[in-house]
Every structure is written in structure tokens, then in C-alpha cells.
Swiss-Prot record:
CDD domains assigned to the protein according to its UniProt record, in alphabetical order: RNase_PH_bact (cd11362)
Catalytic activity: tRNA(n+1) + phosphate = tRNA(n) + a ribonucleoside 5'-diphosphate
Protein name: Ribonuclease PH
Alphabetized GO MF terms: 3'-5'-RNA exonuclease activity; RNA binding; tRNA binding; tRNA nucleotidyltransferase activity
Stored PROSITE patterns: RIBONUCLEASE_PH (PS01277)
Key words of the record: Nucleotidyltransferase, RNA-binding, rRNA processing, Transferase, tRNA processing, tRNA-binding
Key word Transferase present: yes
Record InterPro entries: ExoRNase_PH_dom1 (IPR001247), ExoRNase_PH_dom2 (IPR015847), ExoRNase_PH_dom2_sf (IPR036345), PNPase/RNase_PH_dom_sf (IPR027408), Ribosomal_Su5_D2-typ_SF (IPR020568), RNase_PH (IPR050080), RNase_PH_bac-type (IPR002381), RNase_PH_CS (IPR018336)
One of the protein's GO biological processes: rRNA catabolic process
The keyword Cytoplasm is assigned to this record: no
SUPFAM superfamilies: Ribonuclease PH domain 2-like (SSF55666), Ribosomal protein S5 domain 2-like (SSF54211)
EC number in record: 2.7.7.56
Binding site for phosphate: R86, G124, T125, R126
Organism in which the protein naturally occurs: Yersinia pestis
Length: 238
């Protein structure tokens, strides 16, 4: 039996609180059960050097965990003097995922930075970051249009992500930490609103998984992500 008696295909209780901070062009507190991530979108004029003069924008991301977002305190990476490999991998994933949602040519020479700070971790922090940052990004783009800095909204559609895995032989959606740590197979799936895949990251931690199990996990992820899309739309319409 899963924690909180969730069904195998069920996403944890999901909340997206917009305008959570007052300074950023977009800010969202996203909560998947006990996982809580603050996602902010910052708009700046100009682009990285490698894009100058090309008439297109850029979307990048940074990810971090508060020292006591986990069971025991982890030192800040700033205190260590460098970011860890996991952090770099996750923030690149967030940036890639959100760039897929935007027509960078229509964005013009603006850079949008998505900062995802984990306040409390209970599994699925990278997928929660993507789903929350998408809403923060949508708010930031809407403000660019409303201010007259952009003629049309360059957002092509929503992006959401969820974790799936096989735990004790059963395929489960949106893994909590206790499930993730015991999973035989762990997978993160990122999708566009139209159903196309942006990224699939899957690893067999113990027993290798079959082709049929892979397809079952992707179907499970699709259903969970559809629930997240509905929550994103409801938040943006509120």
C-alpha cells in the first residue's frame, strides 16, 4: 500500500501558488505532497554572448536545495565553492525542458532565468521544479506582452514532468522519497501539452526493465502529467 493510500496512477496533492514573491516577473510555490519548490522567473534584456545579434532569446535555469530541505542538513554548495554534478544535471534539464515551450525567435533578445529552490524535499524535486517553473515562465511572458515589450506571446504550450518507477514489481506514478529510494526502476518524463516527449530519463537500479514495462511507465507518466496540466491551467486562469 502506498503512503496516504494513493492509487498507483495517482499524483500527490498538487498546489501551484502564483505571485508567491513580489519582485520576480513570475513566481510560483509548487507543492507535490510534502515536496515544496519555489520557482521564480526573472526577465533581463540581452542574451549570452554566443547569441548576440541573432535576434533570439534564451532561457536558462538554476536549481538548489536549502540546507535543511532534507532529513539532515546539507552544506550550501556556495560554502563548498562549487556546484555538484547532480545540481548541474538538474538545472540543465529544467532549462532544456522550458526552452522547448518557447519560440526563442519570437522572444527576441531577452534572457529569462528560472530559479528553482527546494524548500522541502520528499522525492520528485526536479519534476516539480519543471512543472512549477513553467507557470512562472508563463506569467513572466504574459507581463512582457502586457508591457508592450513583446507583440505576441512566444509560448508554444505548457510543459510538465513527473517521476514514475517500479517499486516491488508495481509501476507507480509520482514517487515519494520512501518509494524512490526503494525503486527497482526510476524514470523522469517531461512532456509538452500536445503529448510530445521532451525528455525521458530512466534507470534500472536493480532488475533491468522490459520493453513492455517501459511502455507501461510512459503511459502512467502521460496520465499523471495530464493531471498536472489541468492544475497548471487552473492556476493560470485564477
Amino acid at each position: 500500500m502506498r503512503p496516504a493510500d494513493r492509487a498507483a496512477q495517482q499524483v500527490r496533492p498538487l498546489t501551484l501558488t502564483r505571485n508567491y514573491t513580489k519582485h520576480a516577473e513570475g513566481s510560483v510555490l509548487v507543492e507535490f505532497g510534502d515536496t515544496k519548490v519555489l520557482c521564480t522567473a526573472t526577465v533581463e534584456e540581452g542574451v549570452p554572448r554566443f547569441l548576440k545579434g541573432q535576434g533570439q532569446g534564451w532561457i536558462t535555469a538554476e536549481y538548489g536545495m536549502l540546507p535543511r530541505s532534507t532529513h539532515s542538513r546539507n552544506a550550501r554548495e556556495a560554502a563548498k565553492g562549487k556546484q555538484g554534478g547532480r545540481t548541474l544535471e538538474i538545472q540543465r534539464l529544467i532549462a532544456r525542458s522550458l526552452r522547448a515551450a518557447v519560440d526563442l525567435k519570437k522572444l527576441g533578445e531577452f534572457t529569462i532565468t528560472l530559479d528553482c529552490d527546494v524548500l522541502q524535499a520528499d522525492g520528485g524535486t526536479r519534476t516539480a521544479s519543471i512543472s512549477g517553473a513553467c507557470v512562472a515562465l508563463a506569467d513572466a511572458l504574459n507581463k512582457l506582452v502586457a508591457s508592450g515589450k513583446l507583440k505576441a506571446n512566444p509560448m508554444k504550450g505548457l510543459v510538465a514532468a513527473v517521476s514514475v518507477g517500479i517499486v516491488k514489481g508495481e509501476a507507480l506514478c509520482d514517487l515519494e522519497y520512501v518509494e524512490d529510494s526503494a525503486a527497482e526502476t526510476d524514470m523522469n518524463v517531461v512532456m509538452m501539452e500536445d503529448g510530445r516527449m521532451i525528455e525521458v530519463q530512466g534507470t534500472a537500479e536493480g532488475e533491468p526493465f522490459s520493453h513492455e514495462e517501459l511502455l507501461a511507465l510512459l503511459d502512467l507518466a502521460r496520465g499523471g502529467i495530464e493531471t498536472i496540466f489541468q492544475a497548471q491551467k487552473a492556476a493560470l486562469e485564477s
